[in-house]
Swiss-Prot record:
Belongs to the PsaJ family. It is found in: Plastid, Chloroplast thylakoid membrane. Keywords: Chloroplast, Membrane, Photosynthesis, Photosystem I, Plastid, Thylakoid, Transmembrane, Transmembrane helix. The chain crosses the membrane at residues 7-27. Its main location: plastid. May help in the organization of the PsaE and PsaF subunits. The gene is psaJ. It comes from Welwitschia mirabilis (Tree tumbo). This is Photosystem I reaction center subunit IX. It is a single-pass membrane protein.
Amino acid sequence: MQDIKTYLSTAPVLATLWFSSLAGLLIEINRFFPDALTFPFFSF
């Protein structure tokens, strides 16, 4: 039972950190490449 409580208390924290870092990354990409449909570092 203690393991379930530990899991439920850490999963939202990890999800919040992951989504916050992902949102920050997307914001920074849009800051350097505004309104880009294709990104220069993805074109081969």
